Swiss-Prot record:
Signal peptide range in chain numbering: 1-19
Annotated keywords: Signal
Alphabetized InterPro entries for the sequence: DUF2608
Keyword Signal: yes
Official protein name in the record: Uncharacterized protein RP296
Source organism (scientific name): Rickettsia prowazekii (strain Madrid E)
Pfam family for this entry, one: DUF2608
Amino acid sequence: MKRINKVLLSLLCLVIAYAGYSQIIPTYSVDSVTIQNLLPNVDEDTLVLINIDNTIITPKSKLFRYQDNAYINFTKYLYSLAANNASVNKTIAKLIVQRQMMLVESQWVDLINKMKNQGATVLGLQEITAPCNLIENYERWLYTILYGLNINFTRKVNDKEVFRFNPSDAEAPIFYLGIIFTGNINKVNTLIEFLKIIPIPPKKIVIFANNKKDLENMDSYLSMVDIGYYGIEYFGWQMLPGSPDNQIAELQQSTFLNTGQWLEDDTAAKMLNK
């Protein structure tokens, strides 16, 4: 009986140790107590990866808001069409480059700078989809959007500002001025490849994302290696106020589908005399 108790105690200790070593934590704001409690653990031994779309930035138009929005699946609808008709990817690419973008929270600027000042390597993480490949110099385009919003990641890795993970593979992930672009592989494999090419692996990794599945996939890999992991499931985008006006949203969708021209909310409102 004593031996059984010792075994159970050992297993419990392992569970507790694992739970403290690998965590996925939800938060609704970068100003939350969760983030404030995390910050003391962010230092020169930490790699921070931040998902970009609907985590750091999001479209300005209320057509893409999360709350009370009957039009939330407009982009998903386009991607579903592209699954059977690759030419639709050109239409999606037009939408991507025409939409005006904004920060989900202005406090992202200070948080990123603070983590960098504490010695962490702070990088953006951007998934590459088929429409992205149709945008000329997509990496430069996204960097310019973020720079214009005062988002500045750690600019160099391996003393380089720009490089492809595998120079002989034209579809391999790219590091571009602080942003990792996934290329033709998923985010987990991109992280695996990134850890292979940096000279000293981090002791801790912090990942911000609005997709829990991404965080769980990262966790599945990082639990097998000797790296502490904090996954931050970020709901900031879902908390943005406002919902689309039906007439404006209908005009935006019909105009874009018929002409390829995207109308921002204020432009569409003027056309409707609103």
